[in-house]
Every structure is written in C-alpha cells, then in structure tokens.
Amino acid sequence: MQKKALVTGSSRGIGAATARALAGSGWRVTINYIQSREKAEALAAELGTEAVRADVSDSAQVQAMFDAAGPFDLLVCNAGIAWSGLLTDMTYSEWRRIVDVNLGGVFNCCRAAIPHMVHEKRGCILCMSSILGVYGGSCETAYSATKGGIIAFVKGLAKELGPSGIRVNAIAPGSIDTDMLSCFTAEDKQAMADASALGRIGRPEDIAAAAVYLASDAASFVTGQILGVDGNMVI
C-alpha cells in the first residue's frame, strides 16, 4: 500500500518542492494551503492527489483536514509566516499570529497525526525550523523565537515518541530562494550568498532533498536531530 504524507503550506516554495520530491519517491502527498488555491490545486493535479485548505493555527480546521484526507504516515510541518522589523514596532496581535502559525500550527498538526502513528508503531514527523532558530536574527526576533521553539519541540517529541517507533526531526534552512526573499534587493541577496561557504543562496530543492532523506528508511536511526541545510552559513 502506498504510504501517505501531508505537507503543510505546500502550494509554493519549499513546501511545493518537498511535495514534488516526496511524490517522486513514491509517497502519496496531500497538499495543504490557506490562500494560494490555484497553485495548490495545480500542484495537486500534477501529482495526482488532493489539495485541502486549512489554517494550521486553527485546531478545528486541522482536525477536519486529517479527517478528510488522513491518516498520514509522514507529516511535514512546513507552513509558516515571517515578520521583519524592530521588536518595539511589533504589536501583540502580530506576535500572537506568528506564534500561533509557526508554533501552534506544529502543535495542532502533530497532535492530529500522532494517534494513528502510535497505533501503527511507526511514522515520521519533519518540522521546518530555520538557521535563525539556531543563531537568532536581528529584526527577526519573533520569527527566530518560533523557529527556536520548533527545535526544542522536536527534541522533546522525539524522546516522547521514540518508544512507539516514530521518528521526529527538523530541517534548519539557511537563505533559500523563495517568495520570502522577494522583499530583499539584489545587493541583499548577494550578501546572503556571500555569507554561505558555498557562495550561493539555497534552492527549495535543496531542502526537499533533505526531507526525502529524513523520511526514508535510510534515516531509520535518525531522530531528534536538526539538519542544517544552509551552505555553512555565517551569521
């Protein structure tokens, strides 16, 4: 039987690349989106699967998504939002929103996915953190906090679920060429490339390849780990 995966926030960018790569590795991948319906449905048609709209910060919507398309053998928590600026310019509602999506979304999706995985005594959870979750970033304090929280979440959950045969890992991307970089100038992007030992910005496919590895049997003894895919970025 074909194994099933859910990739949240997979209508574009890293999520879409990950969905394509997993599908190419034999997974049946459910596409999740909140705003980009046309892109999500086009990707679902390309992969011969379904696209399900759900706001990951809303536990009821997440559960409805799992009821409609699940259960899943692999959960990739990719959905997330960013906020740039001085912390003193950030409102509490903006703080709550980024925490609710980036951390709350991981909690909601994991809580919905775990019962089936525990019952089957197998499963895999991957969460997208960030290099900023490791080192922090100026004018990215809230984003860094949520991505750092994901790292602690993954390490704790891996210990909790290990006895049930479930692996939990995270990927910490560096600067990746997605829509999140659209607000940066060419000079800014060059500086990001220069900060990498490899002299370039990463591609979504770089992250997707890491996800395919961590989801595969080749990583059967890998859990509780944070895989940096950043070109040895210097912060």
List each model region and its residues:
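Conserved glycine-rich cofactor-binding loop
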Residues: 11-12
